[in-house]
Curated annotation (Swiss-Prot):
Cytochrome P450 which catalyzes 3'-hydroxylation of p-coumaric esters of shikimic/quinic acids to form lignin monomers and caffeic acid. Involved in the biosynthesis of phenylpropanoids and Amaryllidaceae alkaloids, including haemanthamine- and crinamine-type alkaloids, promising anticancer agents. The gene is C3H. Its EC number is 1.14.13.-. It comes from Narcissus pseudonarcissus (Daffodil). This is p-coumarate 3-hydroxylase. It is a single-pass membrane protein. Belongs to the cytochrome P450 family.
Amino acid sequence: MDPSPLSISIAIFSLLISFLLYKKLTTKLPPGPKPWPVVGNLYDIKPVRFRCFAEWAQTYGPIMSVWFGTTLNIVVSSSELAKEVLKEKDQILADRPRNRAAARFSRDGKDLIWADYGPHYVKVRKVCNLELFSPKRLEGLRPIREDEVTAMVESIFRECTQQDKIGNSLVVRNHLSGVAFSNITRLAFGKRFVNSEGVMDEQGLEFKAIVANGLKLGASLSLGEYVTWLKWMFPFDEEAVAKHGARRDRLTRAIMEEHSLARKESGARQHFVDALLTLQEKYDLSEDTIIGLLWDMITAGMDTTVISVEWAMAELVKHPRVQEKVQEELDRVIGVDRIMTESDFPNLPYLHCVVKEALRLHPPTPLMLPHKASANTKIGGYDIPKGAVVHVNVWAIARDPNSWKNPLEFRPERFQEESIDIKGNDFRVLPFGAGRRVCPGAQLGINLVQSMLGHLLHHFKWELPEGMKPEEIDMTENPGMVTFMHTPLQAVAIPRLPSHLYKRMAVDM
């Protein structure tokens, strides 16, 4: 007698259940909070995720399982486990998880940030390391950075010396944002969209609108991104994303065309768009990859610079002893008859320690961009299945009392007492990541943060608004992938150099 369809179905179902039970019993996942059906731990996670995960690590340990819907996420919160993820198991854990928005924006990983590890990633990484962020190119673009930093100084001086504003506090972030915006658009596109009066041109307004719209679309994630079989209930707004992509590409192509014509007339310049167009044939770079790389640099470099400097300034206003010590070093090395340049950096070790300490306590990306397991592996003795998403809690690691003495104290001297690298070689402090995914623009970021901070402290003394106490500064973070201060820092800027040293050192390049 032939088996009936019902008996075949029952047999298949029984085998499936047996397999799933066997897999569950033999797979040793890291501990973690108990997930709810369908949604996992999504509704247990507090808005500031890295703080929430640090709290959970106190209960479940330095490696834990957190379920985003039906997707397993592994969160590590110790330097030892970070080393295992980013060095010892680096190749297996070097892929990127892409939600639907990231997949569309990156053309399914044709850029650098969202590319899986493979031949394409290796190629574009080589372009970044050898060409875009080479010491020679960074030095060639230095005049742009120094131009924009001195423009910031000029704008602060103009505001704080107005007759009706002397002694008033200013919103520090407003002045930092202008530097970051113009610096990154000039480095990437060779475009300063803002004139000397602060008026933005039409192309600049379009650029800002594209950036804002991209952030809005990227943040609008639905439950369907975390529960694969619910995607049909949460349709992706393909039309809105397609319009955004077309708008972004239209602006970028127009700028690329301008540079292509200029190259024919006067040769290539140092900007990233010129470099990529020049290298397009040598490295077989598609137009999608060139556009993707340009926007990777913009999204990675704009907010993170502002965040890093604002947090550093908050700590320096809160700790006047440290501020005075930096200013003593600046006065000793530079004096009061000229302004600082990047060539002064080797003679300003304490300033560099302040930058390191600020990045330790306030990494701009506190949860490293997620990695994905390309095969089954183990971390800390636990099973990590293929497809699991792995997060490194950089913020928690940098505040771990097992790695740092008095970890919550802002004390730059700790970097004088011990030589500690912050570009991926010391797993206790990882503001730029490490391993195959380490940020290729780390040195550029450090240079700009150090330059901005040095000029702010050399040109001005910074104080709290009248009547405000240091402990009243809001040192909490906004939710999000990057850590803006929840309340923008306000401080009083008091000029400390001769007035002729507050002029912008403009360059045309």
